[in-house]
């Protein structure tokens, strides 16, 4: 069993899983598994009888992680969860983020059923701040919605240029131009400029992602 992202043996911070969650949840139409207690930041730092304190939730002992006990008592609706005061501030922020991302898989046509195009192959030698070791970008598109997704795995907020190859425009039937976009993660509105083999300017918070949705 793998060590938890939030454990002292790995990242020590459950929020650092969010950019990876966005990529895993939004890159395709496949089912997604949320590891037990992950949405509340399970740390795997209990000292279970057989496994011991190893950053993992044991698969050998009869054990009850606190995060799973909390999840079992939460109301079904997010607003009721907020009002219940069953979660501390950090847990609630994380739970809301997971709720938002997982709901988007169902409510966004592009994420639910859209075509996928990976743009990383043209961004490995960026001169506009895009770091392929810490940033990841891709496109999803249906007839009525397109999404430019950019994940930031670094501890610093970024303002970078994401290059979009001409082949992406041909494959996805994208038009060039300036589009009014909305980040599905934050609700923030912005304009994005799309040109064949050109760069699109994007701002992404630390350890987070943007899902810039626009009408193609």
Show the residue positions of the predicted features.
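Active-site neighborhood of divalent metal-dependent phosphoester/pyrophosphate hydrolases
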Residues: 1
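Loop/helix patches that line or flank the sugar-binding groove of alpha-linked glycan CAZymes
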Residues: 4-178
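A residue-level signal for conserved active-site and pocket-lining positions in enzyme catalytic cores
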Residues: 101, 181, 207
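Residue-level detector of conserved, well-ordered beta-strand and adjacent loop positions
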Residues: 139, 182, 213-215
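Short, surface-exposed beta-strand/loop "edge" segments at domain boundaries and coil↔beta transitions
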Residues: 145-146, 157, 187-192, 210
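Solvent-exposed beta-strand/loop surfaces of large extracellular or lumenal domains
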Residues: 178-197
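C-terminal beta-strand-rich structural cap/linker in extracellular carbohydrate-active enzymes
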Residues: 192-216
């Amino acid at each position: 069993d793998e060590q938890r992202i939030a454990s002292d043996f790995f990242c020590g911070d459950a929020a650092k899983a969010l950019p990876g969650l966005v990529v895993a949840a939004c890159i395709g139409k496949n089912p997604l598994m949320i590891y037990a207690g992950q949405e509340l930041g399970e740390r795997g730092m209990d000292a279970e009888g057989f496994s011991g304190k190893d950053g993992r939730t044991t698969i050998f002992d009869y054990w009850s992680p606190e995060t799973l006990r909390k999840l079992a008592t939460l109301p079904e609706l997010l607003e009721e969860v907020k009002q219940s005061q069953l979660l501390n501030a950090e847990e609630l922020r994380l739970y809301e983020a997971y709720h938002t991302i997982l709901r988007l898989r169902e409510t966004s046509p592009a994420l639910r059923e859209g075509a996928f195009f990976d743009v990383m192959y043209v961004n490995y030698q960026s001169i506009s701040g895009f770091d392929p070791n810490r940033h990841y970008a891709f496109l999803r598109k249906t007839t009525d919605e397109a999404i430019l997704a950019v994940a930031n795995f670094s501890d610093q907020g970024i303002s970078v240029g994401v290059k979009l190859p001409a082949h992406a425009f041909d494959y996805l039937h994208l038009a060039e131009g300036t589009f009014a976009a909305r980040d599905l993660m934050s609700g923030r509105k912005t304009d994005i400029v799309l040109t064949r083999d050109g760069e699109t300017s994007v701002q992404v918070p630390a350890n987070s992602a943007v899902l810039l949705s626009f009408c193609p």
